[in-house]
Amino acid sequence: MLLLIALLQGCATQLAPRPGSAPHDADAAPEALVLRFQNSSIAPAGDEAVMAPEALQPGDILLTSMSGFTSVGIRLMTFAPVSHAAVYIGDRQVVEAVGSGVRVRGIEEVLEEETVILVLRYPDLSAEQARNIKDYALKKSGTGFNYLGVTLQIPLSISRRLCELPLVPSALRDACIRSMGVISQVAASESRLFCSQLVLQAYRHAEVPMTDADSRLISPADILHMREGDVSSVRIHRELRYAGHLKYPTPTMVALQR
């Protein structure tokens, strides 16, 4: 039944070591492997998962969603519960790419406006790498928004579901998505940025590439699936760690949003 649902949704899968076995064991016996499905749940594990802004670290990635039309449309298009990505640069400041361009916002404003805020953290990020991420993000402040890149994400988000069918090997899935994104790579600007593109580019500038895939192909949903225990649609260098939620609605609010 789970496999049938995954087939209908184009849900990516991956054979992974069974919990408790040695990680990254290429010679693991088939019985030591389990079929892992892409996970779209972002519900916190409990009250302990809700973090204070003071616990944020420079370089943290904020994945968010709102109740507005644009956010809902992006979530429907990408089959994910998040619609926006931003990077925390320290000093209670966040850099993000929105319709008006790349801007700096205070964390208090982000907390007030967003409905859900999930925080992912790149493991073992050094202070120097975090500074380079900050420098790049601030340098891009005022840069125009990549409207064409976002527009081209619409057909790509639909067509790439073929690449994400269950049991498609990760290497083939990665190559398939890259090939389908050729038009985006040729037509979409690299000088203008949309939200997840900014995050990927900032990390790449700091010589900590999250993936070798073109940043114009990556959506906030793709970043979500780069977390530990999930199945990334594209090949990644390191899994992102879940740091916690800055904000998550009560069950009543979740029911109303649905």
Region roles according to the model:
Residues 1-10:
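Bacterial N-terminal signal peptides
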Residues 10-258:
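Cysteine-nucleophile amide-bond enzymes
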